[in-house]
């Protein structure tokens, strides 16, 4: 009995990254051995993602309200530099995608359009959607995972409770701690969940369906890798004036890997919160910056919108001049920031970008269909980049503020 409890203790306290790697290898092996058995364990992945998505809204709401209510006077939260980093990173991603698309022009074999989808008609519609999400019913926001609304109500409640009694503030702090403990437990189940996700993905999709889009995927993944390993470290270096790679690699390993397999920025919010806690960042800062990043820090989405739009332009023989390409970068960056406010995310914002080149909605929706075909890889890589960057920029801004305080 003691040996059994000792084994469970080792399992609970062992390296989560190594356990996830074992889960990935086991999932691939099972899918290779038997597609039927692999499909049978798919529910493990669905349960894991479901648990993360279920805990994330209440975690964000309570953590934001608690951190603001308990905030000491004259506390610096560093939100302005973090938002600037988010916007800068998203624009840099769109610009990188434009340059790579020009260097390696890609053409598409257009598939049939996607039925039942209604892309936004313009930037105004994207902004309008976001504004209405801001004033959503708080209960509905929690039920539907509307993080713009959750943030707004969480901040509002936190400000209202800021002058309440210490006992009231302590209740919120205790509830926040309790929910964080639940999150830690769910995250420990990641190896089992990712085993189910990997097995199901390989069994149902494989890579035969996406082999025909090798060049398109190469440009997409190349742009994302360039942002993750060159541009983001460069931005971080400018902020913290030291080697950025230990921070960047850790965030990619601990946040990006989970996000890659869950393919959900919302589901990865608890993972990012736990990582920020490990990095000993200021709770008042990351309680707001992480859910905000899941909404507006969309470098991966900007790359997807830009690359697929320019691929459509190249397919139709449309000449893209430098000025239009720069305009596309701006539109893609702004659109990407609203991707969380659109059902279907970045792919359904492609028609909006295509309209810059006079590409018809019918053709644009065929490009969206291509996006869904390669989505198993594109969406996973996009989420990994988006989500890991949230922690990277939050950590960089916090460290820069600490360094400035020491010098000052």
From Swiss-Prot:
TM annotation in the entry: 11-31, 43-63, 82-102, 141-161, 192-212, 216-236, 290-310, 316-336, 363-383
Superkingdom of source: Bacteria
Membrane topology reported for the UniProt record: Multi-pass membrane protein
A GO cellular component annotation in the UniProt record: plasma membrane
Coarse class of the protein's main subcellular location: membrane
GO biological process terms, semicolon-separated: serine transport; threonine transport
Catalytic activity: L-serine(in) + Na(+)(in) = L-serine(out) + Na(+)(out); L-threonine(in) + Na(+)(in) = L-threonine(out) + Na(+)(out)
Keywords of this entry: Amino-acid transport, Cell inner membrane, Cell membrane, Membrane, Symport, Transmembrane, Transmembrane helix, Transport
Location in or out of the cell: Cell inner membrane
Keyword rRNA-binding: no
GO MF, one annotated term: neutral L-amino acid:sodium symporter activity
Pfam family, one: SDF
Alphabetical list of Gene3D superfamilies matching this protein: Sodium:dicarboxylate symporter
SUPFAM superfamilies: Proton glutamate symport protein
Primary role: Involved in the import of serine and threonine into the cell, with the concomitant import of sodium (symport system).
Family under the similarity heading: Belongs to the dicarboxylate/amino acid:cation symporter (DAACS) (TC 2.A.23) family.
Matching HAMAP family: Ser_Thr_transp_SstT
Protein name: Serine/threonine transporter SstT
Protein source organism: Shewanella oneidensis (strain ATCC 700550 / JCM 31522 / CIP 106686 / LMG 19005 / NCIMB 14063 / MR-1)
Lineage start: Bacteria, Pseudomonadati, Pseudomonadota, Gammaproteobacteria, Alteromonadales
